A protein has these predicted regions:
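Cytosolic juxtamembrane amphipathic/interface segments immediately preceding
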Residues: 1-9
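Helix-loop boundary elements of multi-pass alpha-helical membrane proteins
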Residues: 1-2, 82-88
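Hydrophobic, small-residue-rich membrane helices and short re-entrant helix-turn-helix hairpins
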Residues: 5, 158-171
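Hydrophobic cores of alpha-helical transmembrane segments in multi-pass integral membrane proteins
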Residues: 9-37, 49-82, 90-116, 131-154, ...
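Membrane-interfacial helical/loop segments at transmembrane boundaries in membrane proteins
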Residues: 42-44, 120-124, 197-217
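Short, flexible coil/linker elements and helix-boundary hinge sites characteristic
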Residues: 47, 159-162, 195, 204
Length: 234
């Protein structure tokens, strides 16, 4: 009954934990760097050129890729099993996974080529290759598609079970997905309107002009700001 959903869940969560493991391996390198032990030259053969490149890969894999893929996989499993119903449109969930994985691959290329070294995740006005932002946007959009698939399934379940309250786990999963979609709208807007060089920048609304409005931001090195923030939190 849940064969398709279980396979998709396995793919989502499998990708999530692979990303987590790889990201975690880069974490100690940052600690050792601050302790005066620079191991990055030994990693250049596998594409890791510097502390800041490793920091970006670590942030993307742990904070974004792991979170997004795990959420979509877990909520798909929780919703369908709680409703005791297979997905209304299985192809929607398959499409979501394909879009997310394609986005991950597109993002990985500039990351490994040192074309997206923009601190922990992405910090404008540092500039990455457009493919980096496009790939991450696809990951977010894919997670939205998963959410739509869950809503379609819940709507079908409601029609089949009139007057029956939605099971708590399914209800919580759907609310979580709706909140996720609302919260990630800002990420997608930042990618499309500020970071990706698109037609928007032709009319003077790109990130360059936005940040030039503030002299302090314009002349401050983002790396120094980031390190200062980390030090302040400690």
């Amino acid at each position: 009954m849940y064969a398709h959903e279980n396979r998709l869940t396995a793919w989502h969560i499998g990708i999530a934990f692979v990303a987590l493991m790889v990201g975690m391996l880069l974490g100690p390198l940052q600690t050792w760097e601050h302790a005066g032990l620079n191991l990055y030259p030994a990693l250049r053969s596998i594409g890791i050129q510097s502390y800041y490149q490793g920091l970006t890969i670590h942030g993307i894999l742990n904070a974004l890729v792991f979170t997004t893929f795990f959420i979509t996989g877990f909520l798909t499993f929780a919703t369908t099993h709680s409703l005791k119903r297979a997905s209304k449109y299985p192809w929607v969930h398959t499409l979501a996974l394909v879009v997310m994985f394609a986005g991950l691959l597109i993002t990985a290329v500039p990351l490994l080529l040192n074309g997206a070294t923009v601190l922990y995740t992405f910090y404008p006005p540092l500039k990455a290759d457009p493919a980096f932002y496009i790939g991450l946007t696809l990951v977010v959009v894919g997670s939205w598609i998963t959410g739509y698939g869950l809503l379609f399934t819940w709507s079908a379940w409601k029609k089949e079970n009139p007057g029956v309250q939605t099971p708590l786990i399914a209800f919580a999963s759907l609310i979580t997905m709706v909140m996720w979609q609302i919260c990630t709208v800002g990420v997608a807007v930042e990618m499309l309107a500020l970071n990706i060089p698109t037609f928007i920048t032709l009319f003077g609304y790109g990130y360059r002009n936005v940040y030039e409005l503030d002299e302090l931001v314009r002349v401050t090195d983002p790396r120094l700001s980031f390190e200062g923030t980390v030090a302040a939190k400690k």
